[in-house]
Swiss-Prot record:
Pfam families: Fox-1_C, RRM_1. The lineage of its organism: Eukaryota, Metazoa, Chordata, Craniata, Vertebrata. GO terms for molecular function: mRNA 3'-UTR binding; RNA binding. Residues 67-86, 99-112 have a biased composition (Polar residues). This is RNA binding protein fox-1 homolog 1. The record marks 117, 125-126, 150, 155, 159, 183, 193 as: Interaction with RNA. Residues 87-98 have a biased composition (Low complexity).
């Protein structure tokens, strides 16, 4: 019996040995960190630490598990705050969107209530405004109907203006492409045409009446820049008595002075109706004195300086007194003197380059020599005037 008791004691002591082996595990105060978060950053537990050292694993687990639950609660609180703020902002944003549908219908109603114009093309040519009004009047109130016409009749298109744009759109959808009297009409929205103001171009040269093209016809001497040979007095004229002489004047191109009208009147004497602009009434008065300083002819009326042209001899034989001539002259310089058939005036038969070289008799020998010296220049000038003034309607 004693032996059995000793064995039992030995077994009990041997069984008590593991109690001593459990002490090293009690020194561990913290469990390994979870979710990769170091242990020193974890929030301290608000409860005091337990006084007993046994069974420390349970408070250790509670100590380690509590901070994640606290962070989760904080995150959930943050997310809840975010969701609340998000819903608040969404509601704030949704407020104007709720108000937009209220303004859009008003804008649509305003746009639909405005008048609208339609362009109707390819309509029958016999259509008139009442026909077009009857065709479109079934869709709504029409303010205006207009069909475009020219001198030959309808141009086949027009415009219809509706009081309400919705009626205009409905009429356009219904009538576009329909066939009326064999013609497929087209109805479209009329667009406003942009009207641009064209800049007016001054057609005059140097500020006076003749442009370069017309000036080359009516005053070739001004554009050629040649030398004019003019007789200073009318040989044998009772209206003017003075020394017989020739005056040399240079025609300046583009000379904007009364010389332009003087040259036009100068040629108007032999052309009978061309170029005579202002000085028609000078036939009834004495000619003005010579003005050799100006680039043109000496006399402002071509009648008194026309001996330079031989073609004027056809008119001189029937020329009456100056007062009678003024009474029978019209605004174009035509003289209805003795011949009753002068209303069908044609160019004189002797009018030509060769006949134009025939001068009136000059008494002064010095004047004759001067005329011989410049004969070539005068011939070229007469030829240019003849081609430019007389044959201005010829094709070549």
């Amino acid at each position: 019996m004693n032996c059995e008791r000793e064995q039992l004691r030995g077994n009990q002591e041997a069984a008590a040995a593991p109690d001593t082996m459990a002490q090293p595990y009690a020194s561990a105060q913290f469990a390994p960190p979870q979710n990769g978060i170091p242990a020193e950053y974890t929030a301290p537990h608000p409860h005091p630490a337990p006084e007993y050292t046994g069974q420390t694993t349970v408070p250790d687990h509670t100590l380690n598990l509590y901070p994640p639950t606290q962070t989760h609660s904080e995150q959930s609180a943050d997310t809840s705050a975010q969701t609340v703020s998000g819903t608040a902002t969404q509601t704030d944003d949704a407020a104007p969107t709720d108000g937009q549908p209220q303004t859009q219908p008003s804008e649509n109603t305003e746009s639909k209530s405005q008048p609208k114009r339609l362009h109707v093309s390819n309509i029958p040519f016999r259509f008139r405004d009442p026909d077009l009004r009857q065709m479109f009047g079934q869709f709504g109130k029409i303010l205006d109907v207009e069909i475009i016409f020219n001198e030959r009749g309808s141009k086949g298109f027009g415009f219809v203006t509706f009081e309400n744009s919705a009626d205009a759109d409905r009429a356009r959808e219904k009538l576009h492409g329909t066939v009326v009297e064999g013609r497929k009409i087209e109805v479209n929205n009329a667009t406003a045409r942009v009207m641009t103001n064209k800049k007016t171009v001054n057609p005059y040269t140097n500020g006076w009446k003749l442009n370069p093209v017309v000036g080359a016809v009516y005053s070739p001497d001004f554009y050629a820049g040649t030398v004019l040979l003019c007789q200073a007095n009318q040989e044998g004229s009772s209206m003017y008595s003075g020394p017989s002489s020739l005056v040399y004047t240079s025609a300046m191109p583009g000379f904007p002075y009364p010389a332009a009208t003087a040259a036009a009147a100068y040629r108007g004497a032999h052309l009978r109706g061309r170029g005579r602009t202002v000085y028609n009434t000078f036939r009834a008065a004495a000619p003005p004195p010579p003005i050799p300083a100006y680039g043109g002819v000496v006399y402002q009326d071509g009648f008194y300086g026309a001996d330079i042209y031989g073609g004027y001899a056809a008119y001189r034989y029937a020329q009456p007194t100056p007062a009678t001539a003024a009474a029978y002259s019209d605004s174009y310089g035509r003289v209805y003197a003795a011949d009753p058939y002068h209303h069908t005036l044609a160019p004189a038969p002797t009018y030509g380059v060769g006949a134009m070289n025939a001068f009136a008799p000059l008494t002064d020998a010095k004047t004759r020599s001067h005329a011989d010296d410049v004969g070539l220049v005068l011939s070229s000038l007469q030829a240019s005037i003849y081609r430019g003034g007389y044959n201005r309607f010829a094709p070549y």
